[in-house]
Design a protein with these regions (language model features):
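N-terminal secretory signal peptides
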Residues: 12-54
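Structural beta-strand segments of beta-rich domains
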Residues: 57-61
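Short, hydrophobic/aromatic beta-strand segments
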Residues: 71-76
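Short, low-complexity, Pro/Ser/Thr/Gly-rich segments in the mature regions of secreted, periplasmic
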Residues: 110-124
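Intrinsically disordered, low-complexity Pro/Gly/Ser/Thr-rich segments with frequent PxxP/GP/PP motifs
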Residues: 15-21, 27, 79-114
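Sec-dependent N-terminal signal peptides
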Residues: 2-12
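Asparagine-centered strand-capping/turn motif at beta-strand->loop junctions
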Residues: 62-69
Length: 124
C-alpha cells in the first residue's frame, strides 16, 4: 500500500485539469512542470504544450505541442466517485500540431503524466 507521502509525490508529478480548463506547461524528466491556467486560445511558446479539457461526448482533451519532440503520455480519467481509469492515448505530435482524445466516460478531471519521447505516430 502506498504511503500518503509517496501518493502525494506521485500526484504532484502529474497535471490535473478539470473540464473547462486550459493549461500551458513544459516537460522535464517526463513530467509536466511550470503549469499555469490560461485562456483556451492561448498560444504555447516554443517548448510548451497547451492542454484543454471539455465535456463533449463524455470527456475530450485537446493538446497543442509547440516543441520539436513527439511524445507518448499517460492520461488518467478521474470520476465523480474519485475512481480512476487509465485511458488509451495517442501520440502527441511535435511542431505545433494538435492532438485530440475523446473517451465516453464523464470525468471530473484528467491527469496527464509520464511523457516519453517517441518516433511513433500511432495510438497505443
Amino acid at each position: 500500500m502506498a504511503t500518503p507521502l509517496l501518493l502525494a509525490a506521485a500526484l504532484a508529478a502529474s497535471l490535473s485539469a478539470q473540464p473547462g480548463e486550459s493549461w500551458l506547461f513544459r516537460i522535464a524528466n517526463g513530467q509536466p512542470i511550470a503549469a499555469r491556467l490560461v485562456a483556451p486560445n492561448a498560444t504555447p511558446a516554443r517548448g510548451e504544450i497547451r492542454l484543454s479539457v471539455k465535456r463533449m461526448l463524455g470527456t475530450t482533451v485537446t493538446m497543442l505541442n509547440n516543441s520539436p519532440q513527439t511524445y507518448t503520455y499517460r492520461a488518467t480519467l478521474v470520476g465523480a466517485d474519485g475512481k480512476t481509469i487509465v485511458a488509451k492515448s495517442c501520440v502527441l505530435p511535435a511542431h505545433n500540431r494538435l492532438a485530440m482524445e475523446s473517451w465516453p466516460q464523464v470525468a471530473v478531471a484528467v491527469r496527464v503524466d509520464s511523457f516519453k519521447p517517441t518516433r511513433e505516430t500511432n495510438c497505443r
